[in-house]
Swiss-Prot record:
Record's catalysed reaction(s): dTDP-4-dehydro-6-deoxy-alpha-D-glucose = dTDP-3-dehydro-6-deoxy-alpha-D-galactose
GO molecular function: isomerase activity
Signal peptide, first to last residue: none
UniProt cross-references to Pfam families, sorted A to Z: FdtA
Protein name per its UniProtKB record: TDP-4-oxo-6-deoxy-alpha-D-glucose-3,4-oxoisomerase
Gene name as annotated: fdtA
Active site: 49 (proton acceptor)
Effect of residue 49 to N: Loss of catalytic activity
Keyword annotations: Isomerase
Species of provenance: Aneurinibacillus thermoaerophilus
């Protein structure tokens, strides 16, 4: 599945708004881990890694941040600023998060538990990993 913006159904009435998140429905995988990022320093970017197998959906519950995605061929830049919008980040995608607003709360839904061996933390290693995947697809 390619990286994509997911527009969650928002239910609005006089009491406020509600968004339901359901695994294997509006989230394209089984959710094994949920974490959130808050109290960020706007000038301090985060991320700067890729995962070999992990899938994620990023949701900005409050405030905003700018996300850069790089699949080795295309670089995308997306601003997340709504709790009714998620960003699917697939495996083998380098991702960076920049320009956090002071009130930003970013929730991340993940397809698996934390596993340090799944991380690619150096951009040069990421490019080599992508080249290897592309060779395997061709051969």
């Amino acid at each position: 599945m390619e990286n994509k913006v997911i527009n969650f159904k928002k239910i609005i009435d006089s009491r406020g708004s509600l968004v339901a998140i359901e695994e294997n429905k509006n989230i394209p995988f089984s959710i094994k881990r949920v974490y959130y990022i808050f109290d960020t320093k706007g000038e301090e970017p985060r991320g700067f890694h890729a995962h070999k197998k992990l899938e994620q959906v990023l949701v900005c519950l409050n405030g905003s941040c700018r996300v850069i995605l790089d699949d080795g061929n295309i670089i995308q830049e997306i601003t997340l600023d709504s709790p009714a919008v998620g960003l699917y980040v697939g495996p083998a995608v380098w991702h960076e998060m920049h320009d956090f607003s002071s009130d930003c709360v970013m929730m991340v839904l993940a397809s698996d538990y934390y596993d340090e061996t799944d991380y690619i933390r150096q951009y040069d290693n990421f490019k080599k990993y992508i080249a290897k995947i592309n060779l395997e697809k061709e051969g």
